Structure formats: structure tokens, C-alpha cells
Swiss-Prot record:
Catalyzes the dehydration of methylthioribulose-1-phosphate (MTRu-1-P) into 2,3-diketo-5-methylthiopentyl-1-phosphate (DK-MTP-1-P). Binds 1 zinc ion per subunit. One of its GO terms (biological process) is L-methionine salvage from methylthioadenosine. It catalyses: 5-(methylsulfanyl)-D-ribulose 1-phosphate = 5-methylsulfanyl-2,3-dioxopentyl phosphate + H2O. This is Methylthioribulose-1-phosphate dehydratase. It comes from Bacillus subtilis (strain 168). It comes from the Bacteria. One of its GO terms (cellular component) is cytoplasm. The gene is mtnB. Disulfide bonds: none annotated. Signal peptide: none annotated. GO terms for molecular function: methylthioribulose 1-phosphate dehydratase activity; zinc ion binding. Optimum pH is 7.5-8.5.
């Protein structure tokens, strides 16, 4: 119980920070944080909640299959909880953050046909643990089928590391790390890269004119 309460506080703090950036439009997005390893349990955002609000029903505990691990409530886990279960079952990740922003949606559409986007030489890449000069990082972009098990299977094919990110085309980004702090850092780094890239392309287009 103590572990659950501590993880709840951690996830609530992350949710608060991301909500202040308006990264949860129209109740979109979902977050989770691991509570126990054996058996695997994690807290995940409840379906349909306004994540800009803070209530005692923001999260619920689920098991390794994404099913509620506790009774006595009518909460349903986020529709995309299956993606989180794949992540925790395949890696040592401890926290997973999924947000919909204009920038990550535009990037995913611009480069969706290439199925990836690569960034190189940006200082912020160091936040992803890559310290060599002119380091580069690639984000895979997967399609966005309406059938969640199909989407989850596509997502599972792209995860192997304990921290990372995947873009879902015209949908959003899922970022993760070993801790809530690391997951948020990864998410922030990629959102910075997306914003920088789009602004640079706009300026280049204006200069060409």
C-alpha cells in the first residue's frame, strides 16, 4: 500500500506538470507508473477523465494484463492500457507517458511514410543519454489502427530499451523511462526536438521565398 501511495504521488505530479503545458486536450493522453514487479502491477490513468483536474479517481491499479487489480470501484483503465502492458512486460521501464500535441502530430504526419524521423547534433539529445559529438537519435513512427490490440502489437515491435519513445501517426507520442523523472525528461526532450524542427522548416521556407 505504501508503494502504491508513493507511486500515485509521483504520477500525479507528472500529470500536473504536463497538464500545465496543455498536453492533454479533450481528455486525451494516458500515463502509467509501475508499482510492483512480482506480480506486475501499475497505476494507469482512468478512462475519460479530464487530466487537468485532480481527483481521487485519476488512476487505478491494474495487473500484467491491464485488468483492474482491485475491486470496489467502477473505474475503467485507459483504452490504450494494452500498450503499457507490453512495455512493462518487455522492458525494465518504470513509467510511461503518452500525450497528444500539435507538434508531435504534425511531425508524425510529415515523416509517417518514412516510418521514422532522425535528429542530429542538437544539444538537447544529451537528455536522452547520448553524449558524443553530433549524436543522433531516431524515433520510429507507427500507423494508428483503430483496433487497439493491432496498435499495441505494432508498438510492441518497436520497444526493447528501458527508455525511449515511439510516435503514433496522427495520434501522439509514447515516451518511457526507468523512473517518472526519466520518462518526463525523455518526453520533454522529444517535444523540444519536434518544436525546433518544425520552426526551422518554417524559417527555411520563408528564407527561400
Amino acid at each position: 500500500m505504501a508503494a502504491k501511495q508513493e507511486r500515485w504521488r509521483e504520477l500525479a505530479e507528472v500529470k500536473r506538470e504536463l497538464a500545465e503545458r496543455d498536453w492533454f486536450p479533450a481528455t486525451s493522453g494516458n500515463l502509467s507508473i509501475k508499482v510492483t514487479d512480482e506480480p506486475l502491477t501499475f497505476l494507469v490513468t482512468a478512462s475519460g477523465k479530464d487530466k487537468r483536474k485532480e481527483t481521487v479517481e485519476d488512476f487505478l491499479l491494474v495487473d500484467q494484463n491491464g485488468e483492474p487489480a482491485e475491486s470496489g470501484h467502477s473505474l475503467k483503465p485507459s483504452a490504450e492500457t494494452l500498450l503499457h502492458t507490453h512495455l512493462y512486460n518487455k522492458t525494465n521501464a518504470g513509467c510511461c507517458l503518452h500525450v497528444h500535441t500539435v507538434n508531435n502530430n504534425v511531425i508524425s504526419e510529415l515523416y509517417g511514410d518514412q516510418k521514422k524521423i532522425t535528429f542530429k547534433g542538437q544539444e538537447i539529445i544529451k537528455a536522452l543519454g547520448l553524449w558524443e559529438e553530433n549524436a543522433e537519435v531516431t524515433v520510429p513512427i507507427i500507423e494508428n489502427p483503430a483496433h487497439i490490440p493491432t496498435l499495441a502489437a505494432l508498438f510492441a515491435e518497436e520497444i526493447s530499451e528501458d527508455s525511449g519513445a515511439v510516435l503514433i501517426r496522427n495520434h501522439g507520442i509514447t515516451a518511457w523511462g526507468k523512473t517518472a523523472f526519466e520518462a518526463k525528461r525523455v518526453l520533454e526532450a522529444y517535444e523540444f526536438l519536434f518544436s525546433y524542427h518544425l520552426k526551422l522548416k518554417t524559417l527555411e521556407h520563408q528564407l527561400v521565398k
